[in-house]
Curated annotation (Swiss-Prot):
NCBIfam families: rpmI_bact. Belongs to the bacterial ribosomal protein bL35 family. This is Large ribosomal subunit protein bL35. Signal peptide: none annotated. It comes from Nitrosomonas eutropha (strain DSM 101675 / C91 / Nm57). Pfam families: Ribosomal_L35p. Keywords: Ribonucleoprotein, Ribosomal protein. One of its GO terms (cellular component) is cytosolic large ribosomal subunit. The gene is rpmI. GO terms for biological process: translation.
Length: 65
């Protein structure tokens, strides 16, 4: 059986936490920022957890994580 390949695009976007949950960075922070409020941009800075319905597909992309 050959080695499974990690999807490199997913490896750059997701990190597995110690408890097993997956964290990701927020979207909507790259451009068109003038119309967004300061509060909105500040809240987009942090990381968030991947939704439960998406965890299985992310784990399939990261077999060795």
């Amino acid at each position: 059986m050959p080695k499974m390949k990690t999807k490199k695009s997913a490896a750059k976007r997701f990190r597995i936490r110690a408890g097993g949950s997956i964290k990701r960075s927020q979207a909507f922070k790259r451009h068109i920022l003038t119309k967004k409020t300061t509060k909105n941009k500040r809240q987009l800075r942090g990381m968030t957890v991947v939704h439960a319905s998406d965890v299985a597909s992310v784990r399939a992309m990261l077999p060795y994580a």
